[in-house]
């Protein structure tokens, strides 16, 4: 809502992040989002958005027992889960047995398929928007706006405005 973006992307910022309870402290905010990133709005084509979602799916693997987890290079020797993004409100599915570039089997926004040539706006942190995290589709020239406040300040202000409703509907599937 703040940026007017169609889609938002966020990362698992810390392997110690547990989310929030009913009562939230500043410590909880900092544990869940320890970086002083700012929120950006980025202009992308649907094809670029698909590549970004595809890249994120590439962090995952399915073992012989069918269990899905992170590829070792993202968790050993040091976890780097802050490079793995999840997206909302798009609905997406990825077949992890397929080769890179073919894993995304569904990518829709409000029930309609993402169109390759259509322009979409993505809300994402400035680290990612400038190309951080090995995502080749991001670059500074795609940034349309950057908010002055960092995430911690925005979370703190948002959480002090009363009860927060969280959409817990799962909008992704990896298989």
Feature roles, as predicted:
Residues 2-175:
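Feature captures C-terminal
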């Amino acid at each position: 809502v703040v940026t007017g973006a169609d889609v938002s992307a966020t990362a698992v910022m810390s392997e110690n992040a547990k989310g929030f309870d009913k009562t939230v402290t500043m410590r909880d905010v900092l544990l869940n989002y320890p970086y002083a990133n700012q929120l950006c709005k980025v202009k992308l084509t649907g094809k670029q958005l698909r590549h970004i979602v595809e890249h994120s799916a590439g962090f995952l693997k399915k073992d012989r027992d069918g269990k899905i987890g992170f590829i070792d290079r993202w968790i050993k020797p040091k976890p780097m889960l802050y490079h793995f993004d999840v997206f909302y409100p798009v609905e997406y599915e990825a077949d992890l047995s397929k080769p890179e570039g073919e894993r995304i089997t569904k990518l829709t926004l409000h029930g309609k398929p993402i169109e390759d040539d259509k322009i979409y706006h993505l809300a994402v942190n400035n680290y990612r928007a400038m190309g951080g995290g090995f995502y080749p589709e991001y670059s500074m020239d795609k940034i349309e706006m950057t908010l002055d406040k960092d995430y911690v300040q925005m979370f703190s202000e948002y959480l002090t405005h009363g009860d927060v409703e969280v959409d817990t509907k799962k909008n992704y599937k990896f298989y």
